[in-house]
Amino acid sequence: MKLPHEFYQLPFRFDVGQLAKEIEQFTESDWVTHHEGFQGNSAIPLISVNGEFNNDFKGPMLPTAALAKSPYIKQILASFGEVLSRSRLMRLAPGAQVPLHSDINYHWYKRVRVHIPITTTEQVQFFCHDKQVHMGAGECWIFDSWKLHKVENNSDQYRVHLVVDLAGSSQFWRTVFQHSRSIADDQSTTLNSQFVGFNPDSPATLITEQFNAPVIMPVAEVEYLTNELLAEVKHNPENLVADVNAFSLLIADFVADWRMLWLQYECTKAGWPHYHALREQTMIKALLCAKSLQLTHSGSAVKAFEQLVIVACMNVELSEQLATRKQAITSPKNSPESANLASVKSASATSTSTSIIPKTAAENNARTIAAPPSRNSPCPCGSGERYKACHGKVN
């Protein structure tokens, strides 16, 4: 995700000793090697598609067996009070590194990765664009994954981080921009951090993503993503004007033709061959006319276009699964599916109420005072005012 600055330290601290105890239970066979073969990189999935040991991005995110036996880690994840995507323990061997790369696919464009170091040393350095930091054990960090970044472990010890991907609510981003410390801020000042310890008597409830990829991407999102890419391409002074103009025309044609197909077929199967043909033809043209174009700090524009838009705009393999889950959500109140939905809502309320993300006074009031049937009714707080002029007042 793009951020105004390369790094932000969030105002939370966690119990490193308890975290270390929980990762000690895992054996070497539990650690899965990196899916792209990065030497010295391994991980243990904690939240994944269908709760399985995979590297998938699309589908319902569920806790894995590894998370089920890690109560403090589960409490930490739940403490954010956010809708969670993928989570894992990420390990970097002594002397190893995470190679220089940028996260340009659809999943990470609007999701940030939260890092909580568990075992680390000063010799572990995280680089992003032209900045670098050491993330201390028990701290909480996010970074701009759209920019090129890498990690070096120049120590003789394993580095292990707990990470979780999330899109972030307004409360989360308010915490980032109002209560956190960016790499541009004075690093000599003390960050006022909240300690989140382990409570063995407090069960944790997670809220996880259920819908994270469209069968066919709506026109508005296609247009938004392509405009974002195009703006960055135009902003890079090293790109040739002729190539930028050719890419601009290609994007405009693609969006216009996608809109025509959407108006005719929306997500129905009859349109699938036409959507596929359009994205295939567009990608071929992009490779011919725009292969030299570069984003500002993130590498190839054509590669980003492919990963962010072309690959992501059509996921027909999810159609039956999504239809079944949507039907369950809209089923009658007395059905088993409705009971499951009620439990999800209950879980959401429970998790949000214990969130470490600060709430505004208005949000706290809204949770304390139940709304009456009509906004013109007397406010339940007993003030004598109408609800709309008291606790229901819209600022």
Which residue stretches match the model-derived regions?
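Charged, amphipathic alpha-helical linkers/stalks
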Residues: 163-240
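Non-heme Fe(II)/2-oxoglutarate
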Residues: 1-79, 186-196, 251, 271-326
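Conserved short histidine dyad/triad with adjacent acidic residue
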Residues: 89-107
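Short beta-strand His + acidic residue motifs that chelate non-heme Fe in jelly-roll/DSBH
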Residues: 100-101, 124-126, 143-144, 148-155
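Acidic/negatively charged segments and metal-coordination signatures
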Residues: 324-395
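A short beta-strand-loop-beta hairpin characteristic of the jelly-roll/cupin
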Residues: 117-137
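A short hydrophobic beta-strand segment most commonly corresponding to one strand
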Residues: 110-117, 140, 156-174
